[in-house]
Amino acid sequence: MLMALPYLLLDGINEDGFAISVLKLDGKPTRQTDASKKTVFTTVAMRMLLDRASTVKEATAMLDKYNMCMDRDTASYHFFMADATGDYAIVEYTGKDVNIKNPTNMETLWQNDTLRCVTNFYVSPTMLNTEFGGDSHHGRDRYNNLRAGLLKHNYNLTSSQALELLKVVAQGPEGSTSSTGYTQWSEVFNLTKRRLTMNILREWDKTFEFGIEQ
């Protein structure tokens, strides 16, 4: 079990200041089947990128060389990534009728201010008028609050301001059975200093700090 721990991740940062997070989407899971490519699963892909990529461009190019296979039958996922240069992107696997068909088209969404945050619905323009994209309410309130907070500070937040924004969108477990219905941890990444601060289960008075030696 200990040997598997490096692959049991939902976000992370590496020594080059590249960071990635994965968030749940509704609909069918991604199942790419290009015979010329090897297949990776969600967390294996994240481990690979944190181990091998230094920038967002390197990470997206690397992902494109593999089939993505997401193992849950009732959910898919999208990735948010950023690096120490200030570059950021969202990677989604899209397609028509994702409520009944497995999405297979990898889309990389770059350098657009509307794409500086994600929650639990597709943000790709190709998914705009779909049940799990533009018409979805899953995570919509959190997304709107994140957008408003980012705009308020012109997308330039201090670590303390970023944490205050995370407090605004944090959710309690009361009455929720969804894995996206309550906040298990909140993290602020400093990609230039290669540091992060973490609060678990909304215990804002208990902060854990981690750094990476270069």
Write out the residue ranges for each language-model feature.
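Short N-terminal edge-element motif at the start of the domain
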Residues: 46-70
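C-terminal, well-structured catalytic/ligand-binding subdomain of enzymes
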Residues: 1-7, 11-51, 74-77, 82-214
